UniProtKB/Swiss-Prot annotation:
UniProt name for this protein: Lymphatic vessel endothelial hyaluronic acid receptor 1
Signal peptide: 1-16
GO terms for cellular component: plasma membrane
Cystine pairings recorded for this chain: 61-128, 85-106
A GO molecular-function descriptor: cargo receptor activity
Chief subcellular location: membrane
Compartments, as annotated in UniProt: Membrane
Gene this protein is translated from: LYVE1
Record keywords: Disulfide bond, Glycoprotein, Membrane, Receptor, Signal, Transmembrane, Transmembrane helix, Transport
Region span, Disordered: 279-322
Coiled coil spans: none
Glycosylation sites: 53
One annotated GO biological process: receptor-mediated endocytosis
Purpose: Ligand-specific transporter trafficking between intracellular organelles (TGN) and the plasma membrane. Plays a role in autocrine regulation of cell growth mediated by growth regulators containing cell surface retention sequence binding (CRS). May act as a hyaluronan (HA) transporter, either mediating its uptake for catabolism within lymphatic endothelial cells themselves, or its transport into the lumen of afferent lymphatic vessels for subsequent re-uptake and degradation in lymph nodes.
Length: 322
């Protein structure tokens, strides 16, 4: 019961004090020193003496639409140039003077927020704060910058996106979009169409000599590589296939020219020449040796000269896809 009685008495005293303060302070008596607020902080005083105690300082700030500032808020304002030469109440229940330059007449030559602890009934001015200020100086349109990690991250992200967009736009034409969408086309399926194969054979006749044998060996060695090249034409374009056919035609023409040039090497021509030579020789011997029939018969009985071994033929085949 005693606790409830003491609590009611306390509330009644506070209410009575508030009524007394409200009755003693009027908004016409309150004056704001300076038209501008720094970081929302300004100095409020009373036009007439005496000045304000701690309770009256709170009420004075309320009458001008502000709240009693704290020591930290006054320190923040001092960093941006807020400086006075008057002690004033703060929320921490002591009086302070914000100083930037040392002055023996202001705060005993102190620098910073000079603190003086005095009784709550002592008379001083008050430092009030406006929490809705977004400018460093309320008289200048300069936005307050804060060290917010989230704000810094968003700013960095925006800058990065802007740089990427600018570099992309510089690479594109003036009529193109601001963003590039890269699409990867699927690889085309390789379609293989059946091709006809044509076999070209060239027959060449040579006498059985060492030179011909050497050439035949070189042809045998080069033939597999040539066939491999022909087989590899399966996937080449039409232009390369046409070039290959022209190459084969040129080879055939060279072979024909070679045969015409060395036509004496054919066996049929050699046999005709051998017959003509034998007949001429027989006629000469008959005219010269009519008186000697025995010798003529011996000569006639002689076996004709054996012809050379029949020539060997080689076949050269070329396989190409058409």
């Amino acid at each position: 019961m005693a606790k409830f009685f003491s609590l009611g008495l306390l509330l009644a005293s506070i209410w009575t004090t508030r009524l007394l303060v409200q009755g003693s302070l009027r908004s016409e008596e309150i004056s704001i020193l300076g038209p501008c607020r720094i970081m929302g902080v300004t100095l409020v005083t009373k036009k007439t003496q005496p000045l304000l105690n701690f309770t009256e300082a709170q009420e004075a700030c309320r009458l001008v639409g502000l709240t009693l500032a704290s020591q930290d808020q006054v320190e923040e304002a001092r960093k941006f140039g807020f400086e006075t030469c008057s002690y004033g109440w703060v929320k921490n229940q002591f009086v302070v003077i914000p100083r930037i330059i040392s002055n023996p007449k202001c705060g005993k030559s102190g620098v910073g927020v000079v603190i003086w602890r005095s009784s709550l009934s002592s008379r001083h001015r008050s430092y009030c704060h406006n929490s809705s200020d977004i400018w460093i100086n309320s008289c200048l349109p300069e936005i307050i910058t804060t060290d917010d990690p989230l704000f810094n991250t968003e700013t960095a992200t925006y800058t990065t996106k802007l740089m990427v967009s600018d570099s992309t736009h510089s690479e594109l034409s003036t009529d193109g979009p601001d963003y590039v969408t890269t699409t990867v086309a699927p690889p085309l399926a390789s379609t293989s169409t059946p091709r006809k194969r044509k076999l070209i054979c060239i027959t060449e006749a040579f006498m059985d000599t060492s030179a011909v044998a050497t050439e035949r060996e070189s042809d045998i060695q080069n033939r597999p590589a040539f066939k491999n090249e022909a087989v590899g034409f399966g996937g080449v374009p039409t232009a390369l296939l046409v070039l290959a056919l022209l190459f084969f035609a040129a080879a055939a023409g060279l072979a024909v020219c070679y045969v015409k040039r060395y036509v004496k090497a054919f066996p049929f021509t050699n046999k005709n020449q051998q017959k003509e030579m034998i007949e001429t020789k027989v006629v000469k011997e008959e005219k010269a040796d009519d008186s000697n029939p025995n010798e003529e018969s011996k000569k006639m009985n002689k076996t004709p000269e054996e012809p050379k071994s029949p020539p060997k033929t080689t076949v050269r085949c070329l396989e190409a896809e058409v």
